[in-house]
Amino acid sequence: MRTLSLLLIWATGTLASDAPRLRALIVDGVNNHDWQAGTRGLRQILEATGRFTVDVSTSPGREAPATAWDAWRPEFDKYDVVINNFNGGHLEDGLRWPAPVEEALLKYLRRGGGLVIFHAANNAFLNWPEYQEIVGLLWREPKFGPGLIVNGQGRVETIPAGEGPKAGHGPRHDFQMEILDPQHPITQGLPAKWLHPSEQLTHGQHGPAEGLKVLTYAYSKDSKRNEPMDWIRRYGRGRVYTTMLGHTWLNEPNPNYDCVGFQTLVARGIEWAATGKVTIATPSELPAPDHAVLRPLGER
């Protein structure tokens, strides 16, 4: 049986009290998931580390008039890291940001900014070519481009374009996360394998699939393959961290956000995207292959 322990505080020494805080901006507003719950959970996780201050820029709604979109201009350059929690759809007619906002994000990244692609945000912007390059692997048809898996020897293997299953997922469930690169600052000190509760395990990602460093993976019962869960890449001088974790759905509990493994991995990934370094320590109690450890975030 899965053992669920409750952690009330981060490990002592996670962050020096006088260390400067990083400025994080979460962008949300449209998503097929419960993006309000996702944004609240992310904010709580980041603020609990003491390393971040967090602002939110919520876009107009899908049916908002052009005047509302014309007035929406997130100021990316004010922040150390931008977290994308926006998904306008994964089809050709998916909702895009206004051209000035897209160009501002590209300039921000090219100049050395940090970007996080959070869960369903990797589904977005099929009709924005630069976005495919930024993310590397996305919710796309097999014909779109190559895919990546982790083979039985722990090596990343390329699946040619046109092959492999379509992007998809089964119902949320507990599954085992595995660390592919234990020496990277984001994953260093985390257990080699740990149980993550009640999460959506996405399979069949495709894209340019170039220049990625896969950090974690999980075995999908649907695709019968080891699927990348977290990865990083560079875009210009900028740093991009993608996590497929963080599923939320309307009128469903989200114990995956209470998972200490998830909280630690995501907070460190966001810090790396912001600075290229990681100072957030691992908590004193960590999950194991057969049990999760939970630190409740409270009502989301």
Task: Label each PLM-derived region with a short phrase.
Residues D18-L22, A37-G38, A48, P74, ...:
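Extracellular ligand-binding/catalytic regions of CAZymes and related secreted enzymes
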Residues M1-L4:
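Positively charged n-region of N-terminal signal peptides that target proteins for export
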Residues G29-N32, G162-K166, G170-F175, T248-V260:
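Active-site rim elements
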Residues F118-K221, T282-R300:
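An acidic, glycine-rich "communication" segment
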Residues L6-S17:
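Hydrophobic h-region of N-terminal signal peptides that target proteins for export
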Residues G112-V116, L215, Y241:
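Structural detector of well-ordered beta-strand residues that form the stable sheet scaffold
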Residues N31-N32, G88-G89, N122-A124, A192, ...:
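Short, solvent-exposed loop/turn segments at secondary-structure junctions
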Residues D18-I117, A121-F125:
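Helical hinge/lid and interdomain linker segments adjacent to catalytic or ligand-binding clefts
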